[in-house]
């Protein structure tokens, strides 16, 4: 798919890469499945960059409008699985 990732230009290159990595995990959750531990590791790093809930919600909404993928639902579902489990969105 072709869409833009929600990026803050005030972030460092490393932070931008980490945020994109998290959204790549969201994509994998919806498309092919992802290991819960890997997903939550990417989300933890995302939260280090975006600690505020309001900003997280805004970024998630921007990504969903662009991609159709609901990051919040992905995080909530993955949280219910053990680290080793492979998780994929239900259709």
UniProtKB/Swiss-Prot annotation:
InterPro entries: BH2638-like_sf, UPF0223. HAMAP family: UPF0223. Belongs to the UPF0223 family. This is UPF0223 protein SAB0963.
